[in-house]
Each structure stands twice: as C-alpha cells, then as structure tokens.
C-alpha cells in the first residue's frame, strides 16, 4: 500500500515510521528543509503522560481574566480579527466543566500512556538516542492553595494507575538537588517518577533516518498546494504544480492542517497556540535540573538535556504570528534564574512555535468522510508526549489493523459540524 504523509514534524515522522515498519510504501512531504523544523524544533522536552491535562478545565475562565492583568501571566490573548479565533475560544469555554474535563482527560491519558509504552519499545528496538532521561517530572507549588488543588489530579492519577509522590518543601531536594537553594520559595511538589525527557528535534531527525532505512522517501522543500478530490476519495496531492498519488493520505500539518482542509469543507477545530522556549548552555551543573520541573504558578517547564537547559511555556492566542516577544523571554528567564541559575543566560537561544490545539485538548486521530484521508493533528502542548502512540495508532487505522487501544472519541467525528463520517 502506498501512503503519503503530509508533514515531517514529530507526528508526521512517527506516522511514517510505523507505517513503513508495517510494510507500507511511504512518502513524506514537507515545505521545510528537514524534519522537525517548526513546532517540534524547540519544545519544552518533556514526555509527561501523567500531566496530560486539558486546558479546558473548571475555573480556567476566571483564571484567564485574572491573568490578563498579570505581567508574567502564562496566558495572553491577542485578538487576531478572525471570527474563527472567537469561535474556537467559545468551544473551549464549553469544555470548562467537570464532566467534559473528565472525558477529555481520559482520552488524553489513554493516548499519552500508550505513547510512552510505544516509545520505550521503539527505544529498545532501535537504540535511538536523543539526550533522553527517565527521571520523572516534578511539579512545583509556590502556594498552599496549589497543593490543595492538586488533589483532584491525584484522584485521576490513582484511577489511571499512575505512580506519584506528593512532597513537602523539605523533600524536593531529594528529587532535584539544586532546589535545596530555592526551598524557601516553595511549599511542595508532585513527583511522577515514570515520566521522561528528551530533545524532540534530535529524536525526530534520528527517527527519520531510521525510517529512511525502512524505505521511507522524504521530500523536503516542497510546496504542498492542495488535495485533489473526486467524490468521497482523495485522488492525489498537488505539489509544485505536479500531482502525486497514493492509496491513502495522512495529514500531519499541525496548526496548518485546518486551512489546508478548508477547500474540502472539513472544518477542523485546530487553532495555533503560540509557545516560547529558551535553550541555555549549562555552566554549573550543581544549579541545573536533573529532569523536568514544572512551575505551576507560571506554567513553565524547565528540562535538562545533556549540557543544556530547555525552558518552555506560555500560551499566546495571536493567530499565526511568529514574532518573538521579549516580555515572554523575560518571564522564562525570571523563572529559570529563580530556580536553576546554572545556565549561561547570555548564550541562550530564544524560539517560538505554534502548537496545534483543539478546544477540548484531545488530538484528532483517525478517519474522515473521505475514504482514504486520515488525520493526525491537534496534539497541542503534548505532541512530543503523544507522538509515538499517535503514529502507531494512525498506522493501524490506515492499514485496517486492530488497534492496541480504543479509538473512541479521538477522531474528527466528535465535532459534529465537521461533517465526518
């Protein structure tokens, strides 16, 4: 079976790898010069199934209003003049209730836990290296109210069988020794020992090389113009004015998937949520993290690679604007220097990317009303966490194999206005 995968971020490359491993003849098309050159390039580096939590949660509307008046707020809303932005925010607000939160959380955890299992198996099979560590994730609380509020998440972790440890301020240094210097600023933390870290860019490029050895044909610097439709099927994809054909097509264009599908009357509810990161060379390992630390107050992740610290976070609703906002850099620097001042901030590189976010925070993985068109997008901040599981899942769906986990609630069908079959 011939399959064309559109997109070479971590989701597209993982999809291509698993398809090829199961015998498909795969071609990957991308406008960039290589894999992982956009959203997968500089993400926070955490692989955190236990923190797979919907952004649309009870209390978020109130918090969003409060954040509008804070200098170092984790969320910023800049109206881009589009009706779509307002519609997407309205859809998200509809999910900010306990019932929707529970449903969405289960779907996200299902994919994320499966994905971690797939990653571990892939690592065992290939020996792939991406500066990975398996030392868990530590969520830090600066306020007692945060320690109390985390009980809701703990109950979900227990239901899902996720290992955790609730720590007081004096115990944080046992997990992250450098935090002994910041103990007076913190009240405690939640440690998930089974989470992992790694450089998504290194991983995606290494996996692309492995996929090439399996026969995957990567075509970069391609202007992917449109899909050619005939009835309920895709007959080809127009690239640089020429038509390429396959038996099946997988769309993994991230935030750009929605506009690409507009001519097909598939209304994909994916909005670009802008995030930022700093990559900082380490000069004093004693003041650097061992794994990933999440600052609950500022919603920022600080992750250890081999000789670098990756600091990622923020959420900005401003359309497809890729400008670098120095105020966001100041927030990332402030949090890092407050907790882990072991990096050379003058040598830090500042980056931004667009996360493809759905209103319910759950990715869109599965079939469409077109018999041979499949979607793998909408992973939001969890593309790295969910990549391998999503790739394996979509490969099984495309090839009509039995899936390892339930696909209930993952396809575009859950959005009735999307005309999905």
Curated annotation (Swiss-Prot):
GO terms, biological process: D-alanine catabolic process
List of residues binding FAD: 3-17
Function: Oxidative deamination of D-amino acids.
Pathway: Amino-acid degradation; D-alanine degradation; NH(3) and pyruvate from D-alanine: step 1/1
Keywords of this entry: FAD, Flavoprotein, Oxidoreductase
Keyword Oxidoreductase found: yes
Protein name per its UniProtKB record: D-amino acid dehydrogenase
Cofactor: FAD
Superkingdom of this protein's organism: Bacteria
GO terms for cellular component: cytoplasm; plasma membrane
Family note: Belongs to the DadA oxidoreductase family.
Enzyme Commission number(s) from the entry: 1.4.99.-
């Amino acid at each position: 079976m011939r399959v064309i995968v559109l997109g070479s971020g971590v989701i597209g490359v993982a999809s291509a790898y698993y398809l090829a491993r199961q015998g498909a003849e795969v071609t990957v098309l991308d406008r960039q010069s290589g894999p992982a050159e956009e959203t997968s390039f500089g993400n926070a580096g955490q692989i955190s199934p236990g923190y797979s939590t919907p952004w649309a949660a009870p209390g978020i509307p109130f918090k969003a209003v409060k954040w509008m008046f804070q200098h170092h707020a984790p969320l910023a809303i800049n109206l881009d003049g589009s009706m779509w932005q307002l519609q997407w925010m309205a859809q998200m607000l509809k999910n900010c209730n306990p019932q929707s939160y529970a449903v969405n959380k289960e779907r996200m955890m299902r994919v994320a836990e499966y994905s971690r299992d797939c990653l571990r198996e892939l690592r065992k099979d290939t020996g792939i290296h991406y500066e990975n560590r398996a030392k868990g994730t530590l969520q830090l609380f600066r306020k007692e109210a945060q320690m109390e509020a985390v009980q809701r998440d703990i109950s979900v972790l227990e239901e899902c069988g996720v290992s955790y440890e609730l720590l007081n301020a004096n115990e944080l240094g046992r997990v992250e020794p450098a935090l002994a210097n910041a103990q007076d600023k913190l009240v405690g933390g939640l440690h998930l020992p089974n989470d992992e870290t790694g450089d998504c860019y290194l991983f995606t490029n290494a996996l692309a090389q492995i996929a090439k050895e399996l026969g995957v044909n990567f075509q970069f610097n391609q202007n992917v113009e449109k899909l050619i439709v005939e009835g309920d099927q895709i007959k080809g994809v127009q690239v640089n004015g020429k038509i390429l054909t396959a038996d099946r097509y997988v769309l993994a264009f991230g935030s750009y998937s929605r506009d690409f599908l507009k001519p097909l009357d598939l209304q994909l509810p994916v909005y670009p949520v802008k995030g930022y990161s700093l990559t900082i060379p380490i000069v004093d390992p004693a003041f650097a993290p061992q794994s990933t630390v999440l600052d609950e107050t500022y919603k920022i992740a600080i992750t250890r690679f081999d000789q670098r610290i990756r600091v990622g976070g923020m959420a900005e609703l401003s359309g497809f604007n890729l400008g670098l906002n120095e105020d966001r850099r100041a927030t990332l620097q402030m949090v890092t220097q407050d907790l882990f001042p072991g990096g050379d901030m003058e040598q830090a590189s500042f980056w931004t990317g667009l996360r493809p976010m759905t209103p319910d925070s759950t990715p869109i993985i599965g079939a469409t009303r077109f018999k041979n068109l499949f979607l793998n997008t909408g992973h939001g901040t969890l593309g790295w966490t969910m990549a391998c599981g999503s790739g394996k899942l979509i490969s099984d769906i495309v090839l009509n194999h039995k899936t390892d986990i339930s696909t209930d609630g993952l396809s575009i069908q859950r959005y009735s206005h999307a005309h999905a079959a």
